[in-house]
Amino acid sequence: MGGLSLLQLPRDKFRKSSFFVWVIILFQKAFSMPLGVVTNSTLEVTEIDQLVCKDHLASTDQLKSVGLNLEGSGVSTDIPSATKRWGFRSGVPPKVVSYEAGEWAENCYNLEIKKPDGSECLPPPPDGVRGFPRCRYVHKAQGTGPCPGDYAFHKDGAFFLYDRLASTVIYRGVNFAEGVIAFLILAKPKETFLQSPPIREAVNYTENTSSYYATSYLEYEIENFGAQHSTTLFKIDNNTFVRLDRPHTPQFLFQLNDTIHLHQQLSNTTGRLIWTLDANINADIGEWAFWENKKKSLRTTTWRRAVFRSFIAQRDRRR
């Protein structure tokens, strides 16, 4: 199992090799290349050899497929913003393509959405599809929605990245990142260009400190998912929520969670307590540009008190 972990790109070797590679972005909208199709829970993945111009290659060993995350291009990664990039369509079969290596993702998503009648909006993952294994934050959302279509696609034509497999659709209950597939053509084959994690490392591993990161989970409830106007609630506990109405960072949500607990503002009844953020709150605190450039979040008592005084201005209690 461990030997099947997602291959990683060593940053130093990637930078050195970048002068000698051609990067071809495989966007489904831009290129009409044949892809594998999910049929009856089986995966048929097109061989890469059939997709390249062989007169440009001395050997197909020079060709490496890599998953690149959209968050590196600066897209908003909070749940309200991300869900606006996804939409439902009918009559279009899912397509998949495999890739050999991938980046670590700062933000991944995991959806469990039901229709008003209780049926599932999203299909289960086909056999062999595992969640994206390198996520700093996993945004787990449950809820309901009209889900007007058979499958949830990316409106910009990007892929949903799973463990070494990119799909055009979202699968239920599986971690994924948004991204595209690039083909790297190396000047000469290098066996060490793509390195595998330790052989005993688990695929969905979160605790081994040797990987220099740990996965944190944030939970949400979404109402009217897939419609033009939806409501996203950040879950503090089973009866306490915060309504999210603007872009924000994961670090801000953790600060919010800590502040509500610190000031004991949890629901103390069987009803639901829903906090509404003050319009003057800065939700961009602790933004991370990339893994290597982490800004220290301001975990001070002064900050907590200021946020507390401001965001508790409004609240809504439902029973």
UniProtKB/Swiss-Prot annotation:
Its main location: secreted. Coiled coil: none annotated. Residues 1-32 form the signal peptide. Pfam families: Filo_glycop. Keywords: Disulfide bond, Glycoprotein, Secreted, Signal. The keyword Secreted applies. It is found in: Secreted. Disulfide bonds join 108-135, 121-147. GO terms for cellular component: extracellular region. Belongs to the filoviruses glycoprotein family. This is Super small secreted glycoprotein. The gene is GP.
